[in-house]
Structure formats: structure tokens, C-alpha cells
């Protein structure tokens, strides 16, 4: 996928207007260890990305310069991610945390990816792991008619409306974010 997604001499700004979706299978580095200081209180912390790039256009986001491309890569091998998470959690007597949404917004394209539909079912069964879902999206349909899952954390970015308008282009308003909580 990198031959299509991230070659040199692409125009990020032009692609951001109408990005393409690239479906791919991630083959290595499915689950990565976070830096030691990157924790919300767990002994072991990991991150992963089921997708590369974001539909939003936040001016301060490192994704604006991370890749040469504004196209989206959606990894389709969710079971491989889940199997890696299960390996990390097996035979552990302590809680682990897995952060989703490092290279994307975890909820933004849920209607296309079905990422959470798959992952939430799996995390219900993994008693010693937490899943943190990072988002600015109000795309919460996946949670409707579902009982809360005790080991799933939804981390919303909430900023004053003036900051949202100035720096977080294409994102929901503060009111919409709060209403979705």
C-alpha cells in the first residue's frame, strides 16, 4: 500500500479536498509499545492504528505533515490486530491499555470501516485490557443500543468553540461533541 499511499511529490492540500480510500493489510508493527511516560496509569501501554490519516483537518495535528499523502489507508485485517492484542494480554496478572486513534480518528469513518463493531466485541472478552478510543467525531451510532463496556474508554477532545473554529477544521462543534457524550 505504501507505493500508492505515500510516494514523493504528492500534493497533500489538493488530496485533502477529495481523498481516496486505500484498503490494505498491515503486515508488521500492528501493536506498538508507547513511550514510558505515555500512560493513563497502566503498567503496560500500547497503541495501534486501524487506519492512516484523518477526515478532519486540524491545523495543529502532526498528521498534517506525517505522510506525503492525504489519502486514507484502512487496514482490513482486524483479526490480526485482535490476535496480537490477545498475545500481549495472555498470562498477564495486571491490566494493560491499548490506545486507538494514533494515526487517525477512531470514530470518524466507523460507518465505512466497522472497526469498533469488531473491536468492541473482542474487548468485552479481554478482562485484563482497556481500549481507549480517541476522537473528535460525533459518529456514535456503534454505541447506540449497546450496554456500556467497562474496559472501553472514549477520549473526546473538547476545546472552546473559538479554538474549534480556528484550528479544528471539518470537526463537529463543541455542542455536538458534548451532546454525543
Map each language-model feature to its residues.
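Conserved Radical SAM active-site core
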Residues: 24-40, 59, 63-155
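Short connector loops/turns at beta-strand edges and beta->alpha or beta->beta junctions
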Residues: 35, 55, 157-161
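Cysteine-centered iron-sulfur cluster-binding motifs in ferredoxin-type domains/subunits
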Residues: 48-58
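Short, conserved loop/turn and helix-capping segments at secondary-structure boundaries
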Residues: 75, 170-174
Amino acid at each position: 500500500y505504501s507505493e500508492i499511499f505515500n510516494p514523493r511529490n504528492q500534493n497533500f492540500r489538493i488530496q485533502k479536498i477529495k481523498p481516496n480510500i486505500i484498503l490494505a493489510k498491515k503486515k508488521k508493527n500492528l501493536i506498538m509499545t508507547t513511550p514510558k511516560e505515555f500512560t493513563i496509569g497502566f503498567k503496560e501501554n500500547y497503541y495501534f492504528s486501524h487506519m492512516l490519516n484523518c477526515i478532519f483537518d486540524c491545523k495543529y495535528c502532526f498528521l498534517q505533515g506525517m505522510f506525503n499523502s492525504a489519502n486514507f489507508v484502512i487496514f482490513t485485517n482486524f483479526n490480526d490486530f485482535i490476535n496480537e492484542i490477545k498475545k500481549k494480554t495472555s498470562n498477564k496478572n495486571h491490566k494493560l491499555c491499548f490506545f486507538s486513534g494514533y494515526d487517525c480518528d477512531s470514530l470518524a469513518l466507523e460507518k465505512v470501516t466497522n472497526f469498533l463493531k469488531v473491536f468492541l466485541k473482542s474487548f468485552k472478552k479481554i478482562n485484563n485490557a482497556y481500549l481507549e478510543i480517541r476522537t473528535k467525531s460525533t459518529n456514535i451510532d456503534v454505541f447506540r443500543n449497546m450496554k456500556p463496556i467497562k474496559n472501553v474508554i472514549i477520549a473526546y477532545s473538547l476545546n472552546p468553540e473559538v479554538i474549534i473554529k480556528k484550528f479544528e477544521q471539518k470537526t463537529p462543534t463543541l455542542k455536538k461533541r458534548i451532546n454525543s457524550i
